[in-house]
């Protein structure tokens, strides 16, 4: 199932012009720590002879396993900037490692699937619409395997920051981190944290929560609700705080309206979306599945303007990431998907005796040359055992070479036959022209 999901995502990403890359698994501590408060997630590496002496080396100089694919991307872009065409659109599907406590939906080692667009100097806002639509399109393809409909919930950091500053709050990053916990711990606990850790009054905390309650499906509705909230809390329209918030509001309204014109209902404005990591500077996204509230977000990301730079040149970007292993786990255990094939082969060529194996291999090679995935029985066991072997691997067809009929005492020479072991149908077949049923041959493979 995981491989089929990977293939589906890759197909959609490449249809939209994204280029696949792979980066090394190991990065320096300095690179890994660029993303903010992530030290607890990093697995550091040591040579055996260094065990017990790790403290002699600063964390920034040590090596660690990457915990996401954005930090390696920023290094890759800087190192290869002279050879890349910007904006650089990349997809990457690779394993990452995090210091998680293993539990359902949380893994220490898992596969992540990312798409990002990186600009040189600047990056047009329209990519902030394009990327969530690409992800929605990819997730829509996975509905064939039981995944529910996905909706992207978007916000903009500038909108939130301007509003918080308009209230008189100064610890904007702290407020964003606490608001990011809203779905996990609830409004009362977030309000308490805002007052205790961010210096907010009870009235300011309530206003922050009121902002987080705002949702809208179009730009006009969003602007009307936001302006009413600003007026209620005394944030005037000619203030610097409102001007900053309005920049974010205009971008968010553009995203929602343009997404609605292309794929209605795929993206909504949801002002509780905060994304706790410090490096996001504009749009932020979380993606939720219909009827799967307990699962939480399955795809997240946002705009970052300051993650990568080279001298005076900055490389702003926008990206989205799917925790693919977590998504596949949900599909297998909750969404009703199932992996009914272990082998990618569509055909198993039977072997009646070892003297006939060369003939079986020739048939297999002719089928493979025509693009039909084929395996050959490992031993010349009884026919029933060979069919059971194919069934255990989920191989839907068993090919009987002509030598089967010829080897039977008193039988006339006959042509090859192929049996669909799912339906029981058995027909004459020629390996130069026979085609498997595409539905049967392409059923889900790879657990």
Enumerate the predicted regions with their spans.
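Positively charged, Gly/Ser-enriched RNA/tRNA-binding surfaces
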Residues: 4-17, 27-30, 38, 58-60, ...
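A cross-family signal for N-terminal binding/gating loops and helix N-caps
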Residues: 20-51, 250
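Acidic, His- and aromatic-enriched active-site or binding-groove loops in soluble protein domains
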Residues: 41-55, 167-201, 289-291
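Conserved phosphate-binding loops in nucleotide/dinucleotide-binding enzymes
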Residues: 45-49, 55-65, 309
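Internal, well-ordered alpha-helical segments in soluble enzyme and binding-protein domains
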Residues: 131, 156-159, 175-178, 190, ...
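Glycine-rich, mobile lid/loop segments that gate access to catalytic sites or pores
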Residues: 151-168
């Amino acid at each position: 199932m995981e491989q089929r999901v990977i293939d589906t995502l890759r197909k959609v990403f490449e249809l939209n012009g994204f280029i696949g890359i792979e980066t090394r698994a190991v990065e320096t501590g300095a690179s890994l720590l660029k993303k903010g408060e992530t030290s607890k997630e990093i697995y550091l590496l040591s040579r055996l002879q260094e065990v017990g002496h790790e403290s002699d080396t600063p964390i920034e100089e040590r090596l660690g396993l990457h915990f996401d694919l954005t930090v390696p991307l920023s290094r890759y872009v800087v190192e290869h900037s002279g050879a890349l065409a910007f904006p650089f659109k990349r997809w990457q599907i690779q394993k990452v490692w995090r210091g998680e406590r293993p539990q359902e939906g949380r893994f220490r080692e898992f596969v992540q699937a990312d798409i990002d667009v990186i600009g040189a100097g600047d990056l047009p806002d329209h990519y902030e619409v394009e990327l969530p639509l690409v992800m929605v399109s990819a997730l829509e393809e996975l509905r064939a395997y039981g995944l529910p409909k996905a909706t992207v919930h978007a916000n903009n950091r500038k909108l939130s920051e301007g509003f918080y500053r308009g209230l008189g709050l100064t610890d904007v990053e702290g407020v964003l981190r606490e608001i990011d916990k809203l779905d996990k711990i609830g409004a009362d606990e977030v309000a308490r944290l805002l007052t205790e850790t961010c210096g907010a009054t009870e009235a300011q905390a309530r206003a922050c929560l009121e902002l987080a309650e705002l949702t809208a499906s179009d730009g006009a509705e969003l602007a009307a609700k936001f302006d009413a909230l600003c007026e209620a809390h005394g944030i005037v329209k000619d203030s610097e705080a409102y001007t900053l918030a309005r920049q974010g509001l205009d971008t968010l309204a553009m995203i929602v309206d343009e997404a609605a014109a292309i794929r209605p209902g795929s993206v909504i404005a949801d002002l509780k979306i905060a994304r706790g990591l410090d490096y996001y500077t504009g749009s932020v996204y979380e993606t939720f599945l219909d009827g799967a509230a307990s699962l939480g977000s399955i795809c997240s990301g946002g705009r970052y303007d300051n993650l990568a730079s080279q001298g005076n040149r900055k490389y702003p970007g926008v990206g989205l990431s799917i925790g693919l292993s977590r998504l596949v786990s949900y599909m297998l255990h909750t969404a009703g998907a199932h992996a009914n094939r272990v082998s990618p082969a569509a055909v198993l060529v039977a072997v009646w005796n070892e003297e006939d194996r060369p003939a079986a291999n020739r048939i297999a090679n002719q089928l493979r040359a025509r693009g039909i995935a084929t395996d050959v029985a490992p031993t010349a066991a009884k026919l029933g055992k060979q069919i059971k072997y194919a069934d255990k691997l989920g191989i839907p067809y068993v090919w009987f070479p002509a030598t089967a009929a010829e080897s039977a005492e008193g039988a006339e020479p006959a042509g090859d036959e192929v049996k669909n072991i799912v339906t029981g149908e058995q027909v004459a077949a020629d390996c130069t022209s026979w085609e498997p049923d595409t539905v049967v041959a392409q059923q889900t493979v790879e657990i």
